[in-house]
Amino acid sequence: MKNLFSIEGKIAIVTGGSRGIGEMIAAGFLANGAKVYISSRKTEACEATAERLVEEYGGECVSLPADVSRLEGITALVSAVAERESQLDILV
């Protein structure tokens, strides 16, 4: 039963992951063994948050800045993840 809800080894994208609730969700995923991609419109904030989360929780957190309120941003984010991963397990 313990492994039923495990996210260890899962691949997650957290949009709005550079601050607030998104950052907290990303931190929780990292702390529980997921590989996390965070996205936000502000490149510097996204990169700084990814670095800080890795320092604090370990694991792998990748910054993929994108404006997902625009179709171009969504397309860019999907392409960036598809280049790196063969699957996606969690989308927030």
Tell where the protein language model's regions lie, with residue ranges:
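Flexible N-terminal pre-Rossmann segment of NAD(P)-dependent oxidoreductases
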Residues: 1-13
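Aromatic pocket-lining residues of Rossmann-like dinucleotide-binding sites
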Residues: 29
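Conserved glycine-rich cofactor-binding loop
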Residues: 11, 18-20
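A glycine-rich helix->loop->beta "capping" turn
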Residues: 56-60, 80-91
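The beta1-alpha1 cofactor-binding region of Rossmann-like NAD(H)/NADP(H)-dependent oxidoreductases
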Residues: 43-44, 65-77
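Conserved glycine-rich Rossmann-like NAD(P)H-binding loop of the short-chain dehydrogenase/reductase
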Residues: 32-49
